[in-house]
Amino acid sequence: GGIYSEAGVVFDNVVYNNNGGGICVYDETSIVNNTIVNNQLYGIGRPADTDVAGSSISVSNSVIWSINPLNHAGLKGFDALVDRVSNCAIVDWDETKGNDNISLLPYNDHTGSVPNFINPTTQIGAILEPVYADLGVSFLLRQNSVLLSKAEGSWMTTLNTYYGTDVSYDIAGKPRIVSKTLDIGAYQYQPVSGRNILYVRQLSPDEPPLADGEVRDGSTWRLAVQDVQMAIDQLYARNAVGGV
């Protein structure tokens, strides 16, 4: 499995493609703003032999998703604890259970109740080399993700007040507060700034020359670059989320 907790806070983690479970929790644990994807047995579960009720466990603002819910439990061993699950997005979940939770479909690039990650893994359990290195896995959120603006800020306030946890940034170091809304999971969606929208067009043979000091950097139609890959490379060099 990925994480085992007997007590404490599990905050801002990405846990994916483990051959066991994602997070195994015993008791007295707050699980907040995690992204838990395509683990073999379950997303979050409890030890099978535990004799502790687990009434001090809470799960909030987390996404628990799998492409194969038939052989994967989003939450395992939580039958008596569903009231402790709030503002989460869970694959194949009964939305009448818990508080303000979302049931996700086992698809990604789709309309409806789907996470719409940038580039999630496409299988369950461990991914073996050398394939793993070429995946370019990303659990950043697209602008049409159902996870946007569905998290509850009070859970993060509690972490800050009682544990001193810095909740200002997501796992990528980006601001958590964007347009006064919070997103479910470890990543906060970051709107594309105007600076990171690059223009591409076919340049004509009689293209007017650039003025002194100007650079064809894609920042305007007049300064558009002529190759999509060139624009993508510029965004990559900036380590920026952008559009072409």
Language-model features: locations:
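Predominantly extracellular beta-rich ligand-binding scaffolds that present long acidic/polar faces
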Residues: 1-144, 157
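Short coil/turn segments at beta-strand junctions that form active-site/ligand-binding loops
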Residues: 27, 54-55, 194-196, 240-244
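Ser/Thr- (and often Asn-) enriched beta-sheet segments in non-cytosolic proteins
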Residues: 56-58, 86, 168, 188, ...
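Surface-exposed intrinsically disordered loops and tails
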Residues: 122-133, 157-167, 205-222
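Active-site and glycan-interaction determinants of carbohydrate-active enzymes
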Residues: 137-182
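Acidic Gly/Asp/Thr-rich repetitive segments characteristic of extracellular carbohydrate-active
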Residues: 172, 204-244
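Short, surface-exposed, low-complexity cationic segments
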Residues: 180-192
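Boundary/junction segments of secreted and surface-exposed precursor proteins
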Residues: 192-207
